[in-house]
A protein has these predicted regions:
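Glycine-centered flexibility sites
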Residues: 23, 47, 62, 156-162
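NAD(P)-dependent Rossmann-like dehydrogenase/reductase catalytic/cofactor-binding core
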Residues: 125-215
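Residues that form or flank phosphate/diphosphate-binding pockets in enzymes
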Residues: 23, 69, 167
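Internal alpha-helical scaffold of NAD(P)-dependent oxidoreductase catalytic cores
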Residues: 27-40, 45-147, 175-182, 192
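Short, contiguous strand/loop micro-motifs
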Residues: 15, 107-108, 159-160
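Rossmann-fold NAD(P)-binding glycine/threonine-rich loop
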Residues: 1-47
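Short beta-strand to alpha-helix junction loop
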Residues: 20-25, 109, 113, 161-163
């Protein structure tokens, strides 16, 4: 509906700032004949939206009309806007399919990281180990990073919940399966998360629930 109303706007950049399946921006641009539509994935967290926006570690802009080696007009216009307001934040331009994949990749990796450290925590419980001491030793390796290693998590529960991680993990599983790529890793992450997690707070979000899931 919004794009129908903006269909005749040919001068200004129209930015889709959301997490959408790979190919969505390209399909919408084709459907509504919008040369000026770009995709900019959202990296905000619900708890710290304002802080995350002002202190972003990167901005990603994707155009459905980008050609390898050629700068596309509208993604460059969007890039200039961000650089003018946030000169110190790096901006990455790419195709819209690539920018859509960036967000899914980041969220699925972090969900996998949460699942991995929950697994280590559970094993430590069985073996009588102190998780925090184990974690301190592991995190001395700078390649690993502290984020998403707390067990239980910030909400006091195990695994991951909310809307983003469950939705994006399941969307990626579907995308992998539709392209005949093994989704075993993410399926294992998801199935284990349902065992670890007490609060299935994603249950009312149809895009975050897989078929035949029951408690």
């Amino acid at each position: 509906e919004c794009l129908e109303k903006l269909q005749h706007n040919r001068e200004q950049v129209i930015m889709l700032k959301s997490t959408v399946p790979v190919g969505t921006t390209k399909n919408l641009a084709k459907k509504f004949n919008l040369k000026n539509l770009v995709h900019c994935p959202e990296f905000l967290t619900a708890a710290n939206a304002k802080h995350d926006f002002v202190n972003a570690d990167r901005t990603v802009i994707g155009s459905p009309y980008r050609i390898e080696g050629v700068e596309e007009t509208y993604s460059e216009m969007a890039k200039e806007l961000f650089k003018r307001v946030f000169p110190d934040i790096p901006v990455y331009t790419m195709t819209s399919c690539e920018s859509e994949m960036v967000k899914y990749t980041a969220n699925c990796f972090l969900a996998t990281k949460v699942g991995f450290f929950n697994m280590i925590f559970m094993l430590g419980e069985k073996l009588g180990l102190n998780y925090n001491r184990v974690l301190a030793g592991v995190l001395s390796d700078p390649r690993i990073g502290k984020s998403h290693t707390a067990v239980p998590g910030p909400d006091g529960d195990y695994g991951f919940g909310g809307t983003c991680f469950p939705k994006d993990v399941n969307a990626m599983i579907t995308t992998l399966q539709n392209n005949h790529i093994s989704s075993y890793i993410l399926e294992s992450v998801w199935n284990d998360n349902m065992k670890y997690r007490t609060n299935w707070d994603w249950a009312n979000n149809t895009s975050a629930v897989r078929a035949n899931e029951t408690r």
